[in-house]
């Protein structure tokens, strides 16, 4: 049974402005595994990746009904599988979590659905 759905839309240039003012922003949003991948990318790809993870984690927190605050960005990890599909690999949710991240123009959108296994 679906127990939560959250979406988030993020302007990539807004994330880039924050990152350019303070590169430690990436450390706040990304887990160690996500950060290791991030460091391998070109600047443009870093910004789309960071914005996508931000949107994905915001969408997850909305699906949980808490928003970021009761959860932290470090509580949630999103890693791409071998086909390039984003997968939530770490979270406080005990059921199944599904995520989709899409980039278009200067924006990134993420949607998360939470399914209870009981």
UniProtKB/Swiss-Prot annotation:
The EC number(s) this enzyme carries: 2.7.8.7
The alphabetical list of record keywords is:
Cytoplasm, Fatty acid biosynthesis, Fatty acid metabolism, Lipid biosynthesis, Lipid metabolism, Magnesium, Metal-binding, Transferase
Question: From its record, what is one biological process in GO terms?
Answer: fatty acid biosynthetic process
> What highest taxon heads this organism's lineage?
Bacteria
Reactions accelerated catalytically: apo-[ACP] + CoA = holo-[ACP] + adenosine 3',5'-bisphosphate + H(+)
GO-annotated molecular function: holo-[acyl-carrier-protein] synthase activity; magnesium ion binding
Enzyme group, top EC level?
transferase
Residues annotated as binding Mg(2+): 8, 58
Q: Which residues form a coiled coil?
A: none
Q: Quote the Pfam families the UniProt record gives.
A: ACPS
List where in the cell it is found.
Cytoplasm
Q: Does the keyword Lipid biosynthesis apply?
A: yes
Cofactor(s) the protein requires to work: Mg(2+)
InterPro entries of this UniProt entry?
Answer: 4-PPantetheinyl_Trfase_dom, 4-PPantetheinyl_Trfase_dom_sf, ACPS, Ppantetheine-prot_Trfase_dom
Q: What does this protein do?
A: Transfers the 4'-phosphopantetheine moiety from coenzyme A to a Ser of acyl-carrier-protein.
Q: Which family does it belong to?
A: Belongs to the P-Pant transferase superfamily. AcpS family.
Q: What is this protein called?
A: Holo-[acyl-carrier-protein] synthase
